[in-house]
């Protein structure tokens, strides 16, 4: 078995390199974030070569080849592949807290829901997730962003499922609660859920990487919304703004520590 855990923007190039060896490739367990990687792998290598997976544990990178497990939550494996149950068993033998899921897409979209939180907002505004949630108006923006994703999931007939160590259904429920009730709970989760790291979009943008997964996460919400006639204005503005910053079409200082500017852009969209 091969393990596929790349950033989504690296997937196309990686698959181009693997295509000539498709008939020799073993099944691929895909742990990448987003909802487009497994279909791309299936198209390049064959439907029988891909196993849908997800990781909820928090991992930190201290240097090249040096990683640390910051918080053990677990691994999700979708049923449907001949190796799914055996793989789940072996992962549990390794104490990785693996769990099988009936529906691959519900599992992947539920994981993506958790990846959306404070991710582009943190990068665009150069603020921590905790700082984003501490701002009442930004918190409202985060909730609306999540509601859009949930509406898109519902339109596709997908279910929100809890993932290992990650109560995703509680996150979905929080979008229906009064802000005064949900905000303290999610604010604490936002500050601790990623271990000691800044959100991934912030890391990529402020390291000058020149690429962002926002097109594969929030952008995926926008594209699915267009397909299923579900409005996604917040996700659209966040995607377009972060892409523009990543491509250096606008300077980082344009929105840095200026939440009112981002909020105004969303309201005027």
Where are the language model's segments positioned?
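Rossmann-like NAD(P)(H) cofactor-binding subdomain of soluble oxidoreductases
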Residues: 1-66
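Internal alpha-helical scaffold of NAD(P)-dependent oxidoreductase catalytic cores
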Residues: 20-21, 43-49, 66-166
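NAD(P)-dependent Rossmann-like dehydrogenase/reductase catalytic/cofactor-binding core
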Residues: 92, 143, 147-150, 154-269
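Glycine-rich beta-alpha junction loops
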Residues: 35, 55-59, 81, 104-108, ...
């Amino acid at each position: 078995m091969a393990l596929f855990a790349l950033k989504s923007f690296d997937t196309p190039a990686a698959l181009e390199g693997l295509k000539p060896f498709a008939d020799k490739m073993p099944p691929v367990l895909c742990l990448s974030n987003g909802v487009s990687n497994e279909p791309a792998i299936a198209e390049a290598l064959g439907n029988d070569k891909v196993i849908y997976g997800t990781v909820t544990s928090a991992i930190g990178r201290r240097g090249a080849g040096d990683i640390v497990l910051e918080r053990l939550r677990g691994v999700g494996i979708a049923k449907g592949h001949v190796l799914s149950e055996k793989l789940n068993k072996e992962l549990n033998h390794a104490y990785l807290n693996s769990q099988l899921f009936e529906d691959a897409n519900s599992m992947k979209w539920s994981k993506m829901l958790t990846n959306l939180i404070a991710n582009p907002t943190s990068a665009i505004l150069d603020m921590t997730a905790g700082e984003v949630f501490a701002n009442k108006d930004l918190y409202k923006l985060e909730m609306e962003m999540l509601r859009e994703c949930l509406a898109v999931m519902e339109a596709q007939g997908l279910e929100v499922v809890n993932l290992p160590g990650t109560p995703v259904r509680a996150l979905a429920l929080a979008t229906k609660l009064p802000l005064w009730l949900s905000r303290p709970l999610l604010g604490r989760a936002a500050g601790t859920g990623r271990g000691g790291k800044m959100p991934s979009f912030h890391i990529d943008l402020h390291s000058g990487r020149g690429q962002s997964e926002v097109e594969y996460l929030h952008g995926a919400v926008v594209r699915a919304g267009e397909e299923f006639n579900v409005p996604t204005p917040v996700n659209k503005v966040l995607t377009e703004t972060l892409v523009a910053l990543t491509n250096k079409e606008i300077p980082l200082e344009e929105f840095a520590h200026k939440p009112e500017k981002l909020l105004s852009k969303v309201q005027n969209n």
